[in-house]
């Protein structure tokens, strides 16, 4: 293991990552509190409110774990025992897997909601919440099981003289896999990512097509080049499309950086940038949702009127 990893990671990257975590924790907390408050006040929830709130909860826990891991990466001299090392790294990977699966579920669920009655997907509308719940459980188990080798490969680095350890933090590293095992896991990881990202990409393209059709039809009805005022459903669809597009973009960057790490094994900078990219979706996604949520403005106005009156 290269002990100079933290020296090469610039202080700017460290500050950027802690800023990213701080913003992400604050934004996800606000989004989760907003949905909780709307539920307590008795507002009728949208069909996508529960998945979005669930994603916010997953991201909140994931970022808290990431903050604990990053503190050991940048500041600690290494003090985790074997159980802490395996548990923290596995839980962090587990919640990252839940984030991917829940985002995929949200994309598919929104596509089913928006599909016309003539579509084959319309048959899934009535039972979609239950069917998608089973699909989410299956996808999460499948997605997480491919990373289950972490429980064996993750080891504390205190008083260990192994060479060629894969660096994670000052306290924890991965044992190198054999060439056959590495090839097997690489194939499974590639299949997993292609399946999930492909499914998400198809549903995103489908929603974008529906949005364009609806916009064109509205312009024809109004006989004007100016598009009519966006409905709440259209704003929700645009929010989902922005989330999916940003997620696909960050996933592509993450894959590129992961590949570069295999080529530049002695250079820690790709690992530092991968930390930033891997958590950017969890930090930015609640901001995208909050910025397009008109109910927040209405809620603040109603609370202000009650206070004034």
Swiss-Prot record:
Keyword Coiled coil: no
Topological domain spans for side Extracellular: 1-19, 71-93, 156-187, 260-268
Transmembrane segments: 20-40, 50-70, 94-114, 135-155, 188-208, 239-259, 269-289
Cellular compartment(s): Cell membrane
GO BP, sorted A to Z: response to pheromone; sensory perception of chemical stimulus
MF (Gene Ontology): pheromone receptor activity
Described function: Putative pheromone receptor implicated in the regulation of social and reproductive behavior.
Name listed for the protein in its UniProt record: Vomeronasal type-1 receptor 52
Species this protein is from: Mus musculus (Mouse)
